[in-house]
């Protein structure tokens, strides 16, 4: 078994994924409560995509030697990374090319069986405008940083895909 395959089959790799996503969620909460930056509905959806990566990592960390759990974890990771990139790209477009006709809603549209904004409004209730870009670092907006983050998640997923899905011999 190759070193990359061994890495994919242990809890440490899934733990790194989990810690990175938890770090992003904590950063989002710091921006919201520490720096008093109001999250928009797209920001909330991006948080949900990061939460999807957390859930995928938790599935993978349960029993990383079991092929089916790795498969489900990898699938959740991929869907969350692609969806998160798409959302961050759309938010970036709203900020770079603002239009009075292309605005985001003030109310998140979560499924009726999972109203996250009702269950945990302090985390999932939007209070800001999508066209606002109140924070940047190195002349890069938060939406652009999230595009980079989700792209990195996607590249790492691609590197881990085949070794993770091969069974141990």
Swiss-Prot record:
<keyword id="KW-1133">Transmembrane helix</keyword>
<keyword id="KW-0560">Oxidoreductase</keyword>
<feature type="topological domain" description="Periplasmic">
    <location>
        <begin position="31"/>
        <end position="48"/>
    </location>
</feature>
<feature type="transmembrane region" description="Helical">
    <location>
        <begin position="72"/>
        <end position="89"/>
    </location>
</feature>
<keyword id="KW-0813">Transport</keyword>
<dbReference type="InterPro" id="IPR003752">
    <property type="entry name" value="DiS_bond_form_DsbB/BdbC"/>
</dbReference>
<dbReference type="GO" id="GO:0015035">
    <property type="term" value="F:protein-disulfide reductase activity"/>
</dbReference>
<feature type="disulfide bond" description="Redox-active">
    <location>
        <begin position="40"/>
        <end position="43"/>
    </location>
</feature>
<dbReference type="InterPro" id="IPR022920">
    <property type="entry name" value="Disulphide_bond_form_DsbB"/>
</dbReference>
<protein>
    <recommendedName>
        <fullName>Disulfide bond formation protein B</fullName>
    </recommendedName>
</protein>
<dbReference type="GO" id="GO:0005886">
    <property type="term" value="C:plasma membrane"/>
</dbReference>
<keyword id="KW-0249">Electron transport</keyword>
<keyword id="KW-1015">Disulfide bond</keyword>
<dbReference type="GO" id="GO:0009055">
    <property type="term" value="F:electron transfer activity"/>
</dbReference>
<feature type="topological domain" description="Cytoplasmic">
    <location>
        <begin position="164"/>
        <end position="169"/>
    </location>
</feature>
<feature type="transmembrane region" description="Helical">
    <location>
        <begin position="14"/>
        <end position="30"/>
    </location>
</feature>
<dbReference type="GO" id="GO:0006457">
    <property type="term" value="P:protein folding"/>
</dbReference>
<dbReference type="InterPro" id="IPR023380">
    <property type="entry name" value="DsbB-like_sf"/>
</dbReference>
<feature type="topological domain" description="Cytoplasmic">
    <location>
        <begin position="65"/>
        <end position="71"/>
    </location>
</feature>
<comment type="similarity">
    <text>Belongs to the DsbB family.</text>
</comment>
<keyword id="KW-1003">Cell membrane</keyword>
<comment type="function">
    <text>Required for disulfide bond formation in some periplasmic proteins. Acts by oxidizing the DsbA protein.</text>
</comment>
<keyword id="KW-0997">Cell inner membrane</keyword>
<feature type="disulfide bond" description="Redox-active">
    <location>
        <begin position="104"/>
        <end position="130"/>
    </location>
</feature>
<feature type="transmembrane region" description="Helical">
    <location>
        <begin position="145"/>
        <end position="163"/>
    </location>
</feature>
<keyword id="KW-0143">Chaperone</keyword>
<feature type="transmembrane region" description="Helical">
    <location>
        <begin position="49"/>
        <end position="64"/>
    </location>
</feature>
<dbReference type="InterPro" id="IPR050183">
    <property type="entry name" value="DsbB"/>
</dbReference>
<dbReference type="Pfam" id="PF02600">
    <property type="entry name" value="DsbB"/>
</dbReference>
<feature type="topological domain" description="Cytoplasmic">
    <location>
        <begin position="1"/>
        <end position="13"/>
    </location>
</feature>
<feature type="topological domain" description="Periplasmic">
    <location>
        <begin position="90"/>
        <end position="144"/>
    </location>
</feature>
<keyword id="KW-0812">Transmembrane</keyword>
<keyword id="KW-0472">Membrane</keyword>
<keyword id="KW-0676">Redox-active center</keyword>
């Amino acid at each position: 078994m190759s070193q990359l395959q061994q890495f994919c089959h242990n809890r440490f790799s899934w733990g790194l994924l989990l810690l990175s996503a938890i770090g992003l969620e904590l950063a989002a909460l710091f921006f919201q409560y520490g720096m008093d930056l109001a999250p928009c509905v797209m920001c909330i959806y991006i948080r949900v995509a990061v939460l999807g990566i957390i859930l995928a990592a938790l599935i993978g960390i349960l029993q990383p030697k079991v092929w089916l759990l790795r498969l489900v974890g990898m699938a959740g990771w991929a869907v969350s990374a692609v969806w998160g990139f798409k959302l961050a790209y759309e938010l970036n477009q709203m900020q770079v090319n603002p239009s009075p006709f292309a605005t985001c809603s003030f109310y998140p549209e979560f499924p009726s069986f999972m109203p996250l904004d009702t269950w945990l409004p302090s985390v999932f209730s939007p209070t800001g405008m999508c066209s606002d870009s109140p924070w940047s670092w190195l002349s890069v907006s938060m939406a652009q940083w999230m595009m980079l983050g989700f792209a990195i998640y996607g590249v790492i997923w691609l590197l881990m895909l085949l070794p993770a899905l091969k069974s141990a011999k």
